[in-house]
């Protein structure tokens, strides 16, 4: 990583942002010196058309993503009362958990091998996290754990954690495990790459393994007519949902708990077939879950745990009416009769007010410095005019040390155009954005994860939550207008205690985020370029904002994104929630006359809303 940083510093970009009259990429220069020919217009890996991967190959992904157990998941018949009947699952017999026998072939499939780079251990460089400050607020906060032990964790879960090569809990896991074990609700704010997924899976699965399944109605026939999950995990994007599902498969190994995943863009009939075979933990996007609830394929009456991952994004992107319908408009137990856990890297004050409606007597957990960036990530800001961005990008890629590079752009059109340009330069690149089909998006991610494409050009659809091992460099080709999106983007590298590099292309078109960008760099002990300081001063003297806007919800101060509003001001939660939602169209008032009720609230397998409610959650790429 230090070699890559040194190579970057030798590039002719920076404060002066000098333009090049006739740019020749470094790899072309090398070929010309060696007497090589000019690069061909296309490589042979078929990454063309913005990385659409021609042909019909699905590479094991697509509509049947949740079908990892095969066509006969529960032994070919209805689910028995002991929750067993298959060699792939444990059983719950006479109030006891009976794990299945170990399966070495399945273990390699789930956990990989130590030398496999695609299965990254969270133990690497993990001691870097030991000094991270943790602030827990609320009444009677339990003491944190320091190691993975039983108690409080179930013995089978500990074995699976060991198979995953997790050696010690992350800061968020140290607190979330005892908090959930005590039956408390939780709002957890932790820096990206800090183990938030394990932060909710570990305690929820441990309690499930120990307490067993909830009782469900007896149903006869080959399949159950409904699934009765005991845990529901909501995620804003399809990619994040499948990633959580992949982790759930690891940690439910040999147990009675069967995980499933449902999301839009995939074959709903296949997802229904999986649900009919039984589902104990469901990972879902809000739109598809509402669709399945309307179809009567899922009952939430047995839910003990509700988890919202990237909760701030879901509540801020127009998902609140859908989530409120799931939580309050169906048969889910009330807030007093379930545990609710919310996780994200940022929780702005206005989102905390909304989130508080779904929680009871909760503990607020803030892990890491305010600003939520990791010092494991080296941040570089280069002054690059729009006309020079492609040239500078090629320089950075030529200086790469061979790791994976994630390039963020603002528009879908730019993602395709930039990917095609990189392919023309004989670089293995692919793209992911909301206009891709689900099969195309999953295949692009598969190519990137395995290194067949070492450059992924992405819009915001991939910015949140995705954990791709070996991403050594994140490049913000287009800086976002929201500084929190910048935090989440650069968090795709430097994960799990590892080091990473994040480079941002900045020019005066990005001056709306300059003040907060300087704050982020200073808080993470990063170098602030002189041109950035100068523009920040100009903005300050000229009365410029420097505040980022928040899609239709107004600006907010980033200073409270990781602080409990109950301790740091902002008024009473219930008073704010009721008064402001009534005036701003949020919450129950927004549902009235918005297409709720009956069968018209959701549009079948495509998850489109009725015409009256398309203004809510209209960005379908998040479904």
From Swiss-Prot:
Pfam families per record: DEAD, Helicase_C
- Describe the function of this protein: ATP-binding RNA helicase involved in translation initiation. Remodels RNA in response to ADP and ATP concentrations by facilitating disruption, but also formation of RNA duplexes.
Cross-referenced InterPro entries:
DEAD/DEAH_box_helicase_dom, Ded1/Dbp1_DEADc, Helicase_ATP-bd, Helicase_C-like, P-loop_NTPase, RNA-helicase_DEAD-box_CS, RNA_helicase_DEAD_Q_motif
| Protein's name in the database | ATP-dependent RNA helicase DED1
EC number(s) per entry:
3.6.4.13
Q: Which reaction does it catalyse?
A: ATP + H2O = ADP + phosphate + H(+)
One GO molecular function term of this record is: mRNA binding
Where are the compositionally biased (Gly residues) regions? 60-78, 541-557, 594-604
Q: Where is the Helicase C-terminal domain?
A: 392-536
* Entry's family note: Belongs to the DEAD box helicase family. DDX3/DED1 subfamily.
Establish whether keyword ATP-binding is in the entry.
yes
The record's annotation in PROSITE patterns points to:
DEAD_ATP_HELICASE (PS00039), HELICASE_ATP_BIND_1 (PS51192), HELICASE_CTER (PS51194), Q_MOTIF (PS51195)
The lineage is: Eukaryota, Fungi, Dikarya, Ascomycota, Saccharomycotina
**Residues reported to bind ATP:** 190-197
**Primary location group:** cytoplasm
The record's domain comment reads: The Q motif is unique to and characteristic of the DEAD box family of RNA helicases and controls ATP binding and hydrolysis.
Q: Where is this motif: DEAD box?
A: 309-312
Chain residue ranges for the region called Disordered: 1-93, 541-623
